[in-house]
Amino acid sequence: MDVFMKGLSKAKEGVVAAAEKTKQGVAEAAGKTKEGVLYVGSKTKEGVVHGVATVAEKTKEQVTNVGGAVVTGVTAVAQKTVEGAGSIAAATGFVKKDQLGKNEEGAPQEGILQDMPVDPDNEAYEMPSEEGYQDYEPEA
């Protein structure tokens, strides 16, 4: 029985040693896993931060591009509006053809009313008769 007890004792020591090694191995593996997870997490966070920064920068660039296009479009619309108003003024006789496109000093203004067709015979503006008009009474 002594041999049997000695064998069981040795087996127990082996199991304890194996358990210690397993515990140590599991702890080491857990530590490495934790390091790996933290590393991946930090790299993912860096990637997300970089990605968000990149998206924000691209959005800013696109807004700048769109803003520039809007300003350019508004400028073009304003220019065409001025040209159209000048055409109407000349065609109706509000302004004489030789007065169009000149600033206060009498110098021609650039970009206004270029190649505008004007009827040179229409020098005066006549008011239409009032027979076809009705007075407007706003509703209260």
From Swiss-Prot:
Q: Name one GO cellular component term.
A: membrane
Q: Which residues carry this modification: Phosphotyrosine?
A: Y125
As for subcellular location, the record says: Cytoplasm, Cytosol; Membrane; Nucleus; Synapse
Under InterPro entries, the record lists: Synuclein (IPR001058), Synuclein_alpha (IPR002460)
Query: Which stretches are tagged as biased composition: Acidic residues?
Result: 118-140
Positions of modified residues (Phosphoserine): S87, S129
Q: Which example biological process does GO assign this protein?
A: synaptic vesicle endocytosis
Segments of this protein annotated with the region Interaction with SERF1A:
111-140
Q: Which UniProt keywords apply?
A: Acetylation, Cell projection, Copper, Cytoplasm, Membrane, Metal-binding, Nucleus, Phosphoprotein, Repeat, Secreted, Synapse, Ubl conjugation
Please give the chief subcellular localization of this protein: cytoplasm
Q: Where does Cu cation bind?
A: D2, H50
Q: Which GO terms describe its molecular function?
A: copper ion binding; cuprous ion binding; identical protein binding
Q: Which family does it belong to?
A: Belongs to the synuclein family.
Query: Could you identify this protein by its name?
Result: Alpha-synuclein
